[in-house]
Design a protein with these regions (language model features):
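Helix-loop "lid/cap" segments that line or gate small-molecule binding pockets
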Residues: 1, 20-35, 92, 124-125
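Active-site neighborhood of HAD-like aspartate-dependent phosphohydrolases
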Residues: 1-14
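Metal-dependent phosphoesterase signature
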Residues: 7-8, 28-66, 74
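Short beta->alpha linker loops
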Residues: 16-20, 44, 59-63, 84, ...
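Short, flexible loop segments at the rims of nucleotide/cofactor-binding pockets, characterized by
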Residues: 54-59, 83, 152-155
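Hydrophobic beta-strand core positions in alpha/beta domains
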Residues: 79-80, 157
Length: 190
């Protein structure tokens, strides 16, 4: 923030959650103006992110292991649909010791349009051999929730950086505080 003198860092970063690199670039120019040194900023933040990823690892959401373990034990098909490139997602899941829980991983490069469009979730369902109507999806971002809803899945929101606004409350089948609560909810409805 200091080096780039960002006008509204929090607002800008929140607006970028769950979007593609292209949409992030558009958002940053909208917040910071056309002279913003986007490529330099992206390189600096990417280097810092990878440094943290290598030295500290990425945090695993509360209840992730419990939910994924229960899903596998229950015989559920488990997929992941991310705007991030699949090779990055696979690397991160491997480092976190979670890769073995996923039957299908769909990265941003595998869908014609990214979130908030439904394409990425429709592709994941197709690869899993299931209908969207029979699937539950868990999201923490606004664009992810819009994507889940548009694809016809049962959208569950577990807020992280973004608190659920009125739109998210209307899109979500349910809003839960963590993934342990998601597991408990699914035990009752699935």
């Amino acid at each position: 923030k200091e080096k780039y003198k960002l006008k509204d860092a929090k607002g800008m970063f929140h607006a970028c959650i769950g979007t593609t690199i292209e949409k992030t670039k558009e958002t940053m120019f909208r917040f910071e103006g056309p002279d913003f040194p986007y490529e330099e900023f992206r390189k600096d933040t990417s280097n810092r992110f990878h440094e943290i990823e290598e030295t500290e690892g990425l945090p695993v959401k509360k209840g992730a292991r419990e939910l994924l373990s229960w899903l596998k034990e229950s015989g559920a098909n488990v997929g992941l649909a991310s705007s991030t490139r699949s090779e990055t997602v696979i690397r991160q899941l491997t480092h976190a010791g979670l890769i073995q829980y996923f039957d299908v991983i769909v990265g941003g490069e595998m869908a014609k349009k990214s979130k908030p469009e439904p394409d990425i979730y429709l592709e994941a369902c197709k690869r899993m051999g299931i209908t969207p109507e029979s699937a539950y999806g868990v999201e923490d971002s606004y664009n992810g929730m819009r994507s889940l809803h548009a694809a016809g899945l049962h959208p569950i929101m577990v807020p992280d950086l973004l608190e659920p606004n009125e739109e998210m409350q209307s899109l979500a089948e349910i809003i839960l505080p963590d993934l342990i609560e998601v597991r408990d909810y699914l035990k009752n409805v699935w």
